[in-house]
Amino acid sequence: MSFFISLFSIVDTPDDVREYMGISYIKTYLKSKGLDCNARVICKEEMDEVLRSYEDFPKLIGISIYCNTLELVKLFCEKIKKFSPDCHIVLGGAHVMEYEVDILSRMKHVDSVCTGDGEETIWELADRLIHQKSLLNCKGITFRDGDKIIQNERRPDIKNLDLLPHPERERNPKNKKRYFYITGSRGCLGQCSFCGEHKTGGCGVRLRDPVDIVNEMEELWKQYGVDKFHFTDATFEDPGNKGIERAQKIFTELIERQLKFRLVMYTRTNIINKMNNKYYDLAYKAGVECFFVGVESGNQGDLNLYEKKITVQDNLKAIRTVLEHHIYVNYGFICFNPYSTFERIQENLDFLYHSGLVYNSYHILSKMTIMPQSSLKDKMLEDKLIDEFHFDSDIRDYKFVHPEVLEFHSAIYKIINTKHLIDLDSQIAIDRIHYRKNEPLFYDQQLKGIFEEIEDVWNSRNHYLYNYFTEAIRIFKMDRNGDRFNSYIKDNKISEYDKKITILYKKYTIILYKHKKGGV
């Protein structure tokens, strides 16, 4: 009897399709053990087509589940069971930890949940299913046994990541972003109260060998011609001196091999502020075009709430340091949370305006989501801002200590939502850095004028957004229930700035296309 395994990640729309390293690693590991397996990223519209396409339906289907894909995964599981009631469905991913029993109690089509690193656990799960053995004592698996739910002990994390084969990549034509993810480590040392990464990541930070990382990047470049790499490491320089030495080794290895790659990676404010200029000079030379920094807030009250262990001035210093080395700063920012006050929102606006960051209305309207493993979720339960929390609870539905702040946010959010511009702004900024550095003559002759126009629009938009939201707060406080506030927030020019940026982006990408084809 053949035993075929399919692994899936579910996304909202085809435009969201990209790599998911978890299922890629598991697929490659299972294949190295002789099992027949594939992995796919699909959206809702593709579910039926994919399930109908199997000549021999999988005996085991594994699905990555996250809080924001919960309803899609529920729907997919229901469809799977209609096609094949005997197919074993296992869910996994960072957000399932501590909610394994809850998931099985509330999702009747799911047979088991995998906790922690999935490679060895899914392999043993498959082996037991193949040989029709009990799942009792299968480490890392919580499973349904008739009317009972049995939770086995967690499997120890894979400490030596270099023993894992490089994940196979399948260039998906729907992936328009044209970059590969690189997982150089697993685990996180951050203790942010809104996040559970430090719980789900396992035993501290586990590092891969820097030479092996560069080998993987070079192999992908030779095979697919892709020179852009985004590191998934929670913090590229962790842990401590060992992590910093590894980061420098990766940079040095890239430079010595003369590999002209474009790199994006995550870091933290307190890491940036303890590094010296030589590190960022080396990063720039190695091809780092963007550091994603967990800024999160521009006021001290929220930074303390998020347990960031930094100050507003620390954030400003870190931003300046990276920008001064001609590296773009992308950033996490949570402007609204259940404890927000208008004073703190105004401080966030002041911070963004004076920070030197590129920002749009999405940054200003960003609202905290409840991560299942976060300590802030526990505080919200204690403060009765949420009545209860399950894995399928709405991660954006909670009360505010100051309900008028939520009312303000909801009113504007209905009118303005420009999430898509985060990627666009970042892409523009990174392209400017890349071509100014690597093709200065072409940049000066063909691109400089357009990027200067974009810079002007960014500056004008920053100024407009600051004044627009500052005035909106003032009017709301004075005329909360009147027509003046609603009239004011509707009569805005935000979309005009966004359209200008989109037009200029398309203008320079046409030039880049012709340039690559030898036309300019």
Give a label for each model feature:
Residues 66, 94, 234-236, 266-270, ...:
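Active-site beta-loop-alpha junctions enriched in small/polar residues
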Residues 138, 142-181, 503:
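N-terminal [4Fe-4S]-dependent radical SAM core
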Residues 26-31, 35-154, 373:
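Glycine-rich beta-alpha loop elements in corrinoid/cobalamin-binding modules
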Residues 2-10, 31-32, 36, 47-48, ...:
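Radical SAM enzyme core and accessory elements
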Residues 14, 146, 190, 239-241, ...:
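Flexible glycine/acidic-rich beta-alpha junction loops that bind and position SAM and/or redox cofactors
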Residues 11-21, 65-70:
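A short, glycine/small-residue-rich beta-strand->loop->alpha-helix junction that serves as a flexible
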Residues 162-329, 350:
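Radical SAM [4Fe-4S] cluster-binding motif and immediate context
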Residues 100-106, 279, 339-353:
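Catalytic cores of alpha/beta
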